[in-house]
Amino acid sequence: MKKLLIDDFEIEKNDWGYYFTANIDFMQQNSELLLNYDTEDEVSEVELKNILNKSLEKINNVLKKAEKNKPQLMKLLKEKNYINLATEWVKWEEGGIKVEEEENCYLIDDNKVYTPITEKDFEKSMNFGEIGTDIYSDGETEDISVYITFEPDYFAGHCIECYIDKNGNFSVNGLAG
């Protein structure tokens, strides 16, 4: 992942303050990074860029460490039974469509999915599409949230919400959506 710079971000105002967005390369995928800065005050562009700059030092460091921790994330997802849960969701009547001509085969969005889902197929299907955190005027940040979706969509429009701590370690919050 390349180091994120101030100029990589667009800054927009919303009802709760400001947010900064950038498209980044994370885990060798295109992801959207969203940073929220909650304030009721009017803040100049110079001040906003200063706040962003202070936060980016930590964010760059955390994301760099997290990219090296994909095996730790996969171990967590396996321990918390998400690969088996994906298989259950695919087989569920609201999940995939059973292909009658093939054993243990289901269609999801015109993709054939064979059950049980393997760890390799589960990992290949992961998308790190949305990443976000709150930032503060002193440069501090909250743990980073990562929303993992899947292609094919094993969890019928849901994602797995994870957090990345300051050391780049993952924790799993659960299904969201």
What is each of the regions a protein language model found here?
Residues 64-154:
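Amphipathic protein-protein interaction modules
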Residues 1-104:
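N-terminal "domain-start" segment
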Residues 1-20, 120-177:
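Acidic, proline/glycine-rich low-complexity IDRs
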